[in-house]
Amino acid sequence: MEIKLANPRGFCAGVDRAIDIVNRALDVFGAPIYVRHEVVHNKFVVERLKERGAIFVDELEAVPDDVIVIFSAHGVSQAVRQEADRRGLKVFDATCPLVTKVHMEVAKYSNDGCECVLIGHEGHPEVEGTMGQYDTANGGAIYLVEDESDVEQLEVRDPTRLSYVTQTTLSMDDTARVIDSLRAKFPHITGPRKDDICYATQNRQDAVKQLALECDLVLVVGSPNSSNSNRLRELAERCGTAAYLIDGPEDLDKSWFANCKNIGITAGASAPEVLVRDVIEGLKAIGASAPVELQGQEENISFSLPKELRV
């Protein structure tokens, strides 16, 4: 069995920054450091940070007074920010700058009283944070759609003043179809000048398509609650290749590889490379050869840390 590695794969700049913020805060201020929501959607990463003294909570009401709290890479609503300000909590914001870009778009539409459609997955923390940027006090409204059927049922107040934004970790192909449906139903709808789906999501989806065409089976390293990891698995399957989402080598099932000559491995944007290496070792133990790295899009993007943590 030959192993082929997608390129690029794994951590993106926003995830790197978010994890660095938690680690630097622990270095500078010591434990405990509170983090609202999992800083990134990966079990391994979260457990390592817990071991260092990070405490993950779902809501700010679980955070004591006079402590440091970090907002996750997925972003938070304005209501959460206001609560933190009201309580005087010291906040470090690990929101991905590309999510912040979407937040700013929504805030602009809100201030203009322009209705807004968000394409995204209901219940995902990024979606909750983005929806929470819209203030209906200016007379507008924000709507959430996930697929074309949602668009068919969508009714807005003024279709001549309507815009859309998207969650950053969606399937590019699915999102394009939803946007086409929106444009067909609401010809005056406008969108962002630059696509809201982030560069890392696009690059990893392009890479997994190539991987799926060259392999009998694709393994996506990532946690079940990772949106972008799930999209990679779905995309490989749509290419006609069997695909599995795994947290690590402990999830490997020998029966998957009975008739496989080429096994592809990729990783979601929140999955560390160490897990990929562990999976490779697990495959070698059942007869796989050394991995071959495929050609792919080079990434050299990085995001700066808050000033207090640049030590």
Curated annotation (Swiss-Prot):
Pfam families the record matches: LYTB (PF02401)
Positions annotated to bind isopentenyl diphosphate: H41, H74, H124, S226, S227, N228, S270
Pathway named in the protein's UniProt entry: Isoprenoid biosynthesis; dimethylallyl diphosphate biosynthesis; dimethylallyl diphosphate from (2E)-4-hydroxy-3-methylbutenyl diphosphate: step 1/1; Isoprenoid biosynthesis; isopentenyl diphosphate biosynthesis via DXP pathway; isopentenyl diphosphate from 1-deoxy-D-xylulose 5-phosphate: step 6/6
Cofactor section: [4Fe-4S] cluster
GO biological process: dimethylallyl diphosphate biosynthetic process; isopentenyl diphosphate biosynthetic process, methylerythritol 4-phosphate pathway; terpenoid biosynthetic process
Protein EC: 1.17.7.4
Reactions accelerated catalytically: isopentenyl diphosphate + 2 oxidized [2Fe-2S]-[ferredoxin] + H2O = (2E)-4-hydroxy-3-methylbut-2-enyl diphosphate + 2 reduced [2Fe-2S]-[ferredoxin] + 2 H(+); dimethylallyl diphosphate + 2 oxidized [2Fe-2S]-[ferredoxin] + H2O = (2E)-4-hydroxy-3-methylbut-2-enyl diphosphate + 2 reduced [2Fe-2S]-[ferredoxin] + 2 H(+)
InterPro entries, per database record: LytB/IspH (IPR003451)
Top-level enzyme category: oxidoreductase
Cofactor comment: Binds 1 [4Fe-4S] cluster per subunit.
Binding, [4Fe-4S] cluster: C12, C96, C198
Chain coiled-coil ranges: none
UniProt keyword Transport, yes or no: no
Molecular functions (GO terms): 4 iron, 4 sulfur cluster binding; 4-hydroxy-3-methylbut-2-enyl diphosphate reductase activity; metal ion binding
Binding site for (2E)-4-hydroxy-3-methylbut-2-enyl diphosphate: H41, H74, H124, T168, S226, S227, N228, S270
Residues where dimethylallyl diphosphate binds: H41, H74, H124, S226, S227, N228, S270
Protein family (similarity comment): Belongs to the IspH family.
Name listed for the protein in its UniProt record: 4-hydroxy-3-methylbut-2-enyl diphosphate reductase
Organism expressing this protein natively: Saccharophagus degradans (strain 2-40 / ATCC 43961 / DSM 17024)
